[in-house]
Amino acid sequence: MLKRNKLIISLFLMIAIVTLSACSNSTQAPKQQDDNTYTLKIHMVINEQDPVYLGYSEFKKGVEARTNGKVKVELYPNGVLGNDEDLLQQAMLGGNIAVNSDAGRLGVWVPEIGILLAPYLTDTVDEMQKLVKSDLVKKWSTDLSQQKGLTVLSFNYYTGSRNFITKKPISSPEDLNGLKIRTPGSPVWQETIKSIGASPVALPWTETYPALEQGVIDGAEAQDPATYGARLYEVGKYITKTGHIQLWNCLVVGTKWFEQLPKEYQQILIEESTKAGDWTTNKVLSNQKELEDKITAAGAVIKEIDTAPFKKKTEAVYSKLNYQDLRKEVNKVLGK
């Protein structure tokens, strides 16, 4: 009987040891995961004074604080990492790269996204803000992730309305006939400039100033923060407020890199990007008059004009790029 009791006690002790060992291993595994650190490098061609750069600084602070430094964010302005297209490819392949991008570039892969840069798509910034946060745009972003391996953290970085910067005054679309205007190379940009009557020239943003200065191009189109940051007003004195495109940027990462993060960190990146986008939008809107005052103080002429003729001309873009049905979907989201 005594031997039998000793055997039972021994068995209980062995079970207890195994159980404790298993519990110990299960508590240590997540701890090992928590010890991992990740670095995200954000590429952009804009400089350190641009509201979008400042917005990404807010993103950096929020992410690093909420992950206790486990996700580090590094900012690389002025195109020092290379060009957008190459870096988007690196992100697709799993690199720890994020790119400050827009609907024009992403629309090359998911054509529906391109409509976000279509001319005069919405009447107000509030309408556009509603659109970029809608389920419709989230669906397109999901398609981008599934088809091309790029994940949009958020699409709500308003950078301003695009205006023309030229060496001569512009009052109507006819004044732009035949002028060589720098614009990005994606279809929605190119067709918008063509519809107005100008000749689009695709150049990297960093080459725009010398090209305008040397007469390689006759003008450019850009939002005020970018115009001011690049000092384009020094070589293109006349700024015509056509507001033909509202430029909303997005923060894009590679899906492979994103999905290796713990789910908690993935959610933090999305939430902090959305916060940073809203911060950027408010910054651009609140600084608009001050920025225009600085540009005119530097000797430039900013001109308000009747945009109705430009709207009429650019209607052709919607049929050219088969955006008619997409426009109906957009208007449905906006309650129009």
Segments (PLM) and residue ranges:
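Basic, amphipathic alpha-helical recognition segments used for DNA target recognition
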Residues: 140
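Short beta-strand-centered segments that line the small-molecule binding cleft or hinge
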Residues: 130
